[in-house]
A protein has these predicted regions:
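A short acidic (Asp/Glu
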Residues: 15-26, 80-84, 146-158, 176-178
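A short, acidic, amphipathic alpha-helical segment used as a generic capping/interface helix at domain edges
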Residues: 1, 113-134, 148-150
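Redox- and metal-dependent alpha/beta enzyme cores, enriched for Fe-S-associated oxidoreductases
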Residues: 50-123
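Hydrophobic, ordered structural segments
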Residues: 2-44, 148-149
Length: 185
């Protein structure tokens, strides 16, 4: 058929582009995602289940039922006040709890850590579609490592999930700015 039966993804790049890249991958092919581990200087996952847990919470009730934003505080903490998100948006956050540590650059150590994020993310995206009928876009504010970015695009269901409006933090441009819109066809 000319299609590979398996793909391994070793991604490095700007987070918005990695989300877009993930959305272009076929979810009909078995795909593994890998993290470049800085301390150990390897792409190999550590053994075991890992300790990263993900807390999902609603941090702002918006005035418009179809305006939704999602903050991903994984590699670092994103504070609502730093985003410029308007009051009409309902805002949700997924935050990592890495044992006793707050969000940090080295939380993603095992494949299980990534799998738990993917479940939390998929559950929340589905919930947003149910709780905010008519939502066509989720405004996404990510502080996330590369494999998480790729899976954020990869795990969108074509013709089911809303588009992702991706924001990128850039201090030279005054904080978070819209970068691109990701659709999954």
């Amino acid at each position: 058929s000319g299609r590979p039966s398996h793909v391994s993804v070793y991604a490095i790049g700007p987070i918005p582009l990695l989300i877009q890249f993930g959305s272009s991958l076929s979810n009909k092919i078995t795909t593994d995602f890998y993290q470049k581990h800085r301390v150990r200087n390897t792409w190999k996952w550590s053994d075991g289940e890992g300790v990263a847990l993900y807390e999902t919470k609603k941090i702002q009730d918006g005035t418009a039922p179809n305006k939704v934003a999602l903050i991903l505080s994984l590699s670092g903490k994103i504070h609502l006040g730093s985003t410029g998100i308007a009051p009409e948006f309902s805002v949700y956050e997924i935050e990592v709890k890495d044992g006793e540590l707050a969000p940090n650059f080295s939380f993603l150590k095992t494949r299980a850590d990534l799998d738990r994020f993917r479940k939390a993310y998929a559950d929340l995206v589905s919930r947003l579609g149910r709780d905010h009928a008519g939502v066509t876009e989720i405004h996404l504010y990510p502080a996330i490592p590369a494999p998480v970015a790729v899976t954020c695009g990869f795990d969108l269901l074509p013709k089911v999930h809303p588009n992702l409006v991706i924001y990128d933090a850039d201090k030279t441009k005054g904080g978070f700015n819209q970068s691109l819109i990701v659709t999954r066809h």
